[in-house]
Amino acid sequence: MDKLGKFCETIEAAFPFLIKFNPMERLNSLESTEQPSFQIFYGIDAQVKQNLRRVLAAFQQWKVGTHHFSSVSGYGHDDLGRDTLDRVFATVMQAEAAAVRVQFVSGTHAIACALFGALRPGDELLAVAGAPYDTLEEVIGLRGQGQGSLMDFGISYRQLPLTSVGQPDWDAIATAIRPSTRVTLIQRSCGYSWRPSLTIDDIATIIRLVKQQNPDTICFVDNCYGEFVEEREPPAVGADLIAGSLIKNPGGTIATTGGYVAGRADLVEAATCRLTAPGIGSSGGSSLEQNRLMFQGLFLAPQMVGEAMKGNYLIAKTFSDLGYPVSPSVTGPRDVIQAVELGSPEKLIAFCKAIQRFSPVEAYLEPVPAAMPGYESQLVMAGGTFIDGSTSELSADGPLRQPYIVYCQGGTHWTHVALAIEAAVEAIQQL
């Protein structure tokens, strides 16, 4: 049996409901359903290979050895493993410098340190791709009071809305920079919004338009969910600073906590001065025996991202065939987030319950809507993951607000996603 035939049998075994809901016979639907999947998966694997080549070259360049897996205690001064990981990570991210730290408790924390490090009273922060992710609203000062937000420190905020089709407003960006605009915030991922995630080419265009107006304006990219989904990272196209989380893409599903900043050396150091203290910056902070997991997670990351992208393609294809709006589209560029507009709270909750039942950890629990720190709306979340809160492993969640969109993230292997989505479709069909 040829490779395509074997792949088709795998798809049919993992997705029997596709046959149930599709009146066409398997052989008749081969060209329209299974062969495109094979071609798309092959393309993802080719991209994984290129990204892994870049990671491997960085490990070789900086001569990573087993002695880098140990760490020091206390202040964390002269942590050879940590400092070498910083150099490897900077090379992988195509940046001048990087700081990878377990002391970053989340991507939001890393982003906050980056923004507070770069901005001063009287400066303006300009979001150029619509509203930011919910958890950044309190960092900026759009919600909450007296917590030490950017606005509390005299930093102003402005945002440019997206176009009606969810794209950056290029004309508005081309004239948006003011003398006080110190930092532009470019959120790469869709977050909890119905828009395509930004491609590297999109980010390059934004940076070009900003720098044409003021070369000194800092272009900061929230890189969460975007690492390794293309063959270039934002610093390669001119981003001054990026930040993200290790329990997302770059941790390879095994980093237990942490985040990173990468970009210009002075901006990275400024961000670490917000993480630790002025005068300490990147020289402090023990890695707490986590170096080996962070090195290994980075090495695994391209493959894990590829598996998540395959799983998200299957989610998009399945629910699009069933008539649900999906973003990104089946054939559109994607990262590790797949949104499906389910249209009712009952379907959103049923979907998340099914994902939880098909999780390896705490499958016996049932997700219920609840408030979560940093979010305005109640959330329902399915996340039976080995690392608490990991979105590199398969998870699904959504705010309990219209139009009741579920956001699926991650997946250590696409076959697990296939099993979980089969259960989710069955749960929705039974309502």
Regions found by a protein language model. Name each.
Residues F7, E25-F38, V55-Q61, G65-H68, ...:
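Conserved PLP-enzyme active-site core in the AAT-like
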Residues T84, V88, T205, L209, ...:
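Amphipathic alpha-helical segments that form well-ordered structural scaffolds
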Residues L80-A98, A110:
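Long amphipathic N-terminal alpha/beta scaffold segment
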Residues C8-I11, F15-T84, P399-C408:
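N-terminal entrance/gating region of PLP-dependent enzymes' catalytic architecture
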Residues S320-L431:
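Conserved C-terminal alpha-helix-loop-beta "cap" of PLP-dependent enzymes
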Residues E96-V100, D123-L126, R182-V183, D216-C219, ...:
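Structural motif
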Residues H68, V72-S73, A99-Q103, V336-E341:
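Short glycine-rich or small-residue beta-strand-to-loop segments that form or flank ligand, phosphate
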